[in-house]
């Protein structure tokens, strides 16, 4: 029965184009973001391009994570790897990326994209444990992420109307009192417009006291020129991240050598 449940959860994750990744941010506070969920050899995987590696640094500080996608959740302690030469992307991700993220169909067909978009085909990889995956009914459009009773991170779907502009939001999440993060994510039909609103605060019985808001659900219409500028900015960000990424590779290599 466990194997059947795990297999169905993996199938659900494989079918999902978007999910919610929960992790421990600075100050030991849980935070979440919308991600593309992948599988690699039957193991749930979340990645960052080399331009946007903030969540990778967080997981290296605290390996407790959770991924909710397609009505299935993986949670536990993650491992991190830096796969920056594009070979792993080609082998493990390219087909999934083309299927799940429509804008990739343009990017990955550009002549010379492996050289021009080296930061896109290079990835920092978070691998989650497949053992213990379970079905979690409900949509992941609105979720709350917190530290659960077992000390690990959980991402919990929220059903019903949520008053996003309120300072005190009524929530029935089943999580212990403490810091929590409410995330709402929306995507355009072709995923050219990705939007998320994050509310961080303190969870008490039945309510979230909001302390910080970031992001927006307002639709944006980026012109082709603006999108090209965005790609150039991401390339510059990845270049600026190189020293940091190399230090992670050294650290992870040392950990593997001592393991």
Language model segments and positions:
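An N-terminal domain-cap segment
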Residues: 1-43, 146, 151-162
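A general structural signal for short secondary-structure junctions and capping/turn motifs
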Residues: 11, 58, 116-120
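A short, compositionally biased
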Residues: 14-17, 61-62, 139-142, 177
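Residue-level detection of beta-strand scaffold positions
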Residues: 18, 30, 37, 65-67, ...
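Catalytic micro-motifs at enzyme active sites that drive phosphoryl/nucleotidyl and oxygen chemistry
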Residues: 26, 33, 56, 68, ...
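A short mixed-secondary-structure module that forms the rim of ligand-binding clefts
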Residues: 38-71, 153-191
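Charged, gly/pro-rich active-site loop segments
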Residues: 71-152, 172-259
């Amino acid at each position: 029965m466990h194997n059947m449940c795990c297999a169905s959860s993996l199938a659900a994750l494989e079918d999902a184009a978007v999910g919610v990744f929960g992790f421990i941010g600075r100050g030991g506070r849980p935070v979440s973001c919308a991600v593309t969920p992948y599988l690699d050899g039957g193991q749930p995987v979340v990645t960052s391009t080399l331009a946007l590696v903030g969540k990778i640094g967080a997981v290296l500080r605290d390996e407790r994570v959770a991924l909710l996608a397609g009505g299935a959740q993986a949670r536990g302690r993650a491992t991190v790897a830096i796969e920056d030469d594009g070979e792993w992307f080609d082998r493990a991700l390219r087909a999934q990326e083309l299927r799940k993220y429509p804008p990739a169909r343009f990017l990955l067909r550009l002549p010379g994209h492996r050289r021009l978009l080296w930061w896109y085909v290079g990835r920092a990889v978070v691998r989650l444990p497949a053992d213990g995956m379970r079905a979690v009914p409900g949509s992941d459009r609105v979720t709350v992420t917190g530290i659960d009773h077992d000390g690990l991170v959980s991402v919990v779907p929220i059903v019903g109307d949520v008053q996003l502009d309120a300072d005190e939001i009524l929530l029935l999440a089943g999580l212990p009192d403490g810091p929590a993060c409410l995330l709402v994510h929306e995507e355009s039909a072709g995923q050219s417009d990705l939007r998320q609103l994050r509310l961080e605060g303190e969870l008490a019985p039945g309510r979230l006291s909001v302390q910080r808001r970031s992001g927006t659900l307002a639709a944006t219409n980026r012109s082709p020129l603006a999108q090209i500028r965005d790609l150039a900015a991401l390339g510059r960000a990845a270049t600026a991240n190189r020293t940091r990424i190399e230090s992670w590779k050294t650290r992870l290599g040392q950990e593997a050598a001592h393991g």
